[in-house]
Amino acid sequence: MTPPGRLYLPRVRGTRLLFLLLGLLLALPPRAKGLPGVGLLPSAARAAQQHPQKHFAHGTLKPAAHLVGDPSMQNSLRWRANTDRAFLRHGFSLSNNSLLVPTSGLYFVYSQVVFSGEGCSSKAVSTPLYLAHEVQLFSSQYPFHVPLLSAQKSVCPGPQGPWVRSVYQGAVFLLTRGDQLSTHTDGISHLLFSPSSVFFGAFAL
C-alpha cells in the first residue's frame, strides 16, 4: 500500500525503461525536442527545410569585395572587378581605384602583390632595389591617407639570376561607412600580374 501523500511509481527496468523514455520523447512537440523547426510555425518550418538558403539569406548577406590587378596597365596598378575571379557584393563599389565601404563595422582587409626581376646588376657596387606595397585609408575623420597595412622588401645586391618576392598582408579594422580603401605600390614595373598574384579585397565580419 502506498503511504498517504506519496505517488506510486512502478518499477521499470532495462529495455522497458528505454522504450518508455523513447515514447515520451516522440510524444513531445518539435519545439520541446530541439529539432528543426524550433520556434517556427509548421508552415514556416517546412519552408525553412525546403529552401534553407532563401530563408536564412537575409542574415548572411555581408559586404565583400575582391579585386585583381589590370595587366593592361603596366605603369600603374589599377584594380578591376569585372572578371570572373573578382567581384563586388552587397554594397561595395569601386571608384577612382578605391573601395568604398558601404556600412560601418569590422572588416578583414587584405592584399597581395608579387614582384619579379631578371636579375641584379653585375656591377661590383649595385644600387639596392626597394619594393613596397601599402593599403591606405581615406576617411572623413582624416584629411590625408592613413596607412593600414604596409610592407617593404629589398633585392640587389644579391645572387645573379631571376628573383621573385611576394608580399601578403591582412588584418581586421573598424571601418566607417563612406571610408575609402586604396593601395600604393613602389616597384610597379616589377609586378607579376595574374589574378592569383596581385589582388586586393575586404569583407565584413
From Swiss-Prot:
Location within or outside the cell: Secreted; Membrane
Recorded coiled-coil stretches: none
SMART domains in the cross-refs: TNF
Disulfide-bond pairs as recorded: 120-156
The organism of origin for this protein: Marmota monax
Superkingdom, natural source: Eukaryota
InterPro entries in the record: TNF, TNF_beta, TNF_CS, TNF_dom, Tumour_necrosis_fac-like_dom
The family this protein is said to belong to: Belongs to the tumor necrosis factor family.
Physiological role: Cytokine that in its homotrimeric form binds to TNFRSF1A/TNFR1, TNFRSF1B/TNFBR and TNFRSF14/HVEM. In its heterotrimeric form with LTB binds to TNFRSF3/LTBR. Lymphotoxin is produced by lymphocytes and is cytotoxic for a wide range of tumor cells in vitro and in vivo.
Major subcellular site: secreted
Protein name: Lymphotoxin-alpha
Taxonomic lineage: Eukaryota, Metazoa, Chordata, Craniata, Vertebrata
GO molecular function, one term: tumor necrosis factor receptor binding
